[in-house]
Amino acid sequence: MQAVRGLSFDVDAGKTLGIVGESGSGKSVSTQTIMGLVRGARVSGTALFEGRDLLTMGSHDLQQVRGAKVGMIFQDPLSSLHPYYKVGWQIEEMIRQHDKSASKAQARHRAIDLLQLVGIPQPDRRVDDYPHQFSGGMRQRAMIAMAMALNPQLLIADEPTTALDVTVQAQVLQVMKTLQEEFGTAIIMITHDLGVIADIADEVIVMYAGAVMERADRRTIFYENHHPYTEGLLESLPAYGDDRERLLPIAGQPPSLINLPSGCPFHPRCPYVFDRCRTETPDLGPVGGDVTHLSACWLPHDMAARNARRKEVIGHARPMPAEAMAAAETAGGEA
């Protein structure tokens, strides 16, 4: 089974790359494989970090990168934090594992500073609490503190806000943005939540069935997207000022990676599908000659022609980009 195919990206310092898609699209397994966390994975290609290929590194060298230069935040902090050890001790252990010159006292002081940095109240006291004594939002903040303990150049955040309510989610995202501004950290944000993408991402990759469907900057993805899957994800979301009586879910289910359909993997669910989609797999290429906006779709890149196809197939045209932007800004919802 090929879980991910043809994935390529780069992340600059101080920028955030968002990777979005449904469950099983290959979002998480791609970064976990790059960091050597998927046993038995067969990988081709390169993953360059500071000029070195992470995919060919030995386990010892990779261990020196993980935590120190690349921090990771996982979806469930309760399962990521050891229940038998105090939160502060776990952060201190991370520091001392990678900084052999740090004493216990120095590591503890750094742990307290980190907890304060991510907004944990009374950090000098909470440093001695166990994970079960923290709320869900506080545990996630503690995971961010641990991931940022050594000021990594890159932070991989794998669904870090999924289990949090909207208020706590906003607080956690603000903590990450503040840390990014302070330290110039590059972030890879993996999520199925387009609201999170709208809040934090500079560039966005949309994945489906292990492949990239579309890649562009945030504004283009939200207002001038080209791929029907991206369009479907956005149309299935409720929005402020939306007067629709019903949401528009994407029909069907994602395919099994063991038995992918021929042609475009999205064609069984696509409202625009035509014969070529069923037999030929489109390459990821520029939309209308724009090399910063890539899409893997056989639809015309000209928006007017594409809307004509939409009207022919499903009876109404999609608003043009200027109209969509004006409507969003009138509702106060500019991404």
Model-derived segments and spans:
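P-loop NTP-binding/switch modules centered on Walker-like glycine-rich loops
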Residues: G36, L154-P160, L164-R246
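Conserved ABC ATPase "signature" region
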Residues: R52-D53, A105-R125, L234
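Conserved ABC transporter NBD signature motif
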Residues: V43-D53
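A short, proline-enriched helix->beta-strand linker immediately N-terminal to the Walker B motif
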Residues: A149-Q153
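Short catalytic/signature loops enriched in Gly
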Residues: P121-R125, R215-E329
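ABC ATPase NBD coupling module
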Residues: M1, L54-G71, Q97, K104, ...
